[in-house]
Amino acid sequence: MRRSDLVPDCGSCAAICCVATSFEASEDFAFDKPAGVHCRHLTRDCRCAVHDDLARRGLPGCAVYDCYGAGQRMTRAFSVRGQSSLADTANDAERNEAFLILRVVHELLWQLTEAAKLCPATRGDVGATLALEIDALDAIARAPWSDLFDVDLGPHRDAARRLLCRVGDALGGRRAVRSLVVLD
């Protein structure tokens, strides 16, 4: 997978994060929004009506949210099905669920790709094992979106956690690398 596939491209996305995710009123979000409910600022053309003013409106969390490229991948997948925007709500629940799974896959890919830069395959079995897990996650990300519902993320999270700790050990300490580990 290319690094650019793991970077959000909001212009190529149907604002799936503005529907699929939930948030609670806090310093990052001015109001509560349950998962599966369209954000009150989402327009019919899948754009944020207040994007240029998020911080002032009490929504800095929206500005820093990172889907790791999962949003545009899901948008492409559903566009192929003939559902090109959020206006077609027939498959909202499955699209939202698939997006949330794919986002975790993309985040794990990003973490392991970054770790691989620190510990390349030439540094023994850590690099080779990283490459194998990256390939496994890449295959999940590239599979048809409906296959995501059959993915057990637990073993992949565990593998990522172990690999990131091993990279930390190989680099002389775990502290910096542990901050990358997905614990959920």
Regions found by a protein language model. Give the residues of each.
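Ferredoxin-like iron-sulfur electron-transfer modules
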Residues: 1-10, 30-38, 180-184
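Short, solvent-exposed segments of well-ordered alpha helices
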Residues: 1-4, 33, 89-99, 124, ...
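Ferredoxin-type iron-sulfur electron-transfer modules and their immediate structural context
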Residues: 2-17, 159-167
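Local cysteine-cluster metal-coordination motifs and their immediate loop/turn environment
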Residues: 7-24, 37-68, 96-106, 110-113
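Short, flexible helix-adjacent loops and helix caps
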Residues: 22, 26, 117, 142-145, ...
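Surface-exposed helical/coil interface segments that assemble multiprotein signaling complexes
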Residues: 55-88
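Charged, amphipathic alpha-helical linkers/stalks
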Residues: 75-135
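Extended, small-residue-rich solenoid/repeat segments and analogous flexible loops
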Residues: 136-184
